[in-house]
């Protein structure tokens, strides 16, 4: 991961804000410890902290067009950059081997028509440009010649981005809110699948974020009669994983032992021996794939992860942490992940500890299994879905909010140590295949027997299990969903609930809305995390940047209507789903 800071609509001399931009950028240097760069000119400033993964030698940022009239700062990966480079061969003189430079080529093609000189770029043109990108990204582009800017974020929000405003009306964007805290009067998340385009001197008090990412599968009626194919799911995910192995540095996989990470790891192992950039003509820098698991000793995930690693042939690393080590890290974890959401803090802590070990081994990028539960209804509360329509609409809602939760966790807990996380299940092309699959085929369905010969009535993500059963040990292919924060060890969650219930008094909870009028904590654990968050980020904007809603087993609030028992609960653990989880409480 990299980190970016952009400043637009500058009223004073641009150079007067240069030192401020550098200080802001330094706050997110953990995201990109390899190099720093800054552009200061026109009515904009762009700063960049680089984590070099593609083209380490010449891919420093900000990036410039050949005539240096356009400048770009990007946090992201463009997986189809070679295809775009071929398309613009002879039309655009690429300056580096960076995958992100193709964004400049695409933008330049929109402004180079002499007959349209001086005209604004149209919404349709920008949508076409952004839709042509296959990857994860948040970028800020400034056109010095036209005094225009273009800011955009990837469709699902895998890469974080925030936008803020100071009292002078200056506009700021940054990869993390810690760069904006104390600098802006107000700020908010820049919405996934949106862009902002305008003059360097913004006329309104707030950027207009415009949606470019639209899909027919947002609507149940568009998919309800579609076919369902496990083979199509298999082929599309294999293509996604292969695309995302683009790297000029050693990489690995996060392997929890659950279905999703096991599938990603198994596919990655098949391609890891050779470099995908030249169609497997040369061997990879690190031909044997390394896998990583984290948990308390004896945790459910660890034994399963080892089983998968032995089956697929990775070099496996099991990282143990103690409850005390986890507790000691929570204050730092909340600073880096910038949320007080209970599930996210629970799950980010072991991931944060794991990332430190991964970085110490010289690995800069890992693949992870985030997104599958949202796409295929993998959370255990989906067993209660009353209809295919309710099921599908909940998956769409979950995807629309993923940037507040799992995307945030996977990105920021890894980026805290300069490690990039890639998520093949959230690949744009794979999403179209998976979300257009008939929802009936994705609902929790019956199985005749379990691997132990015991009867099982329903299981989640059946179509994914069918698609990849031949690549995994049988007991993994048909293993019940275990949320990451549970799977690292049940005692981790139980201890957090106990300690926070003792640390926060009943009186404090009774007055929670007075201390925290924005998103008042719903329970003592959230109150505990919120208190730490407020020490790091005291502004109202920071508090509003976190999404809050009642939830059972990671459900949205709407899905609480599916089961009468859900209505009086607020517990994000999968063990809260009685009659479904094997160890429900």
Locations of regions flagged by a protein language model:
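Short acidic/histidine-rich active-site segments
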Residues: 363-373, 379
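Glycine-rich beta-strand-to-loop/alpha-helix junction loops that act as flexible
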Residues: 257-258, 368-371, 488
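Cysteine-centered catalytic environments shared across enzyme families
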Residues: 1-114, 120-339
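ATP-dependent adenylate-handling ligase core
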Residues: 230, 294-355, 381-390, 409-419, ...
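Glycine-biased, low-complexity coil/linker segments
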Residues: 117-118, 454
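Short, motif-level signal for alpha-helix interfacial/capping segments enriched in acidic residues
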Residues: 10-12, 235, 348, 403-408
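Hydrophobic (often cysteine-bearing) scaffold residues that line and stabilize catalytic clefts
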Residues: 17, 96-99, 133, 226-233, ...
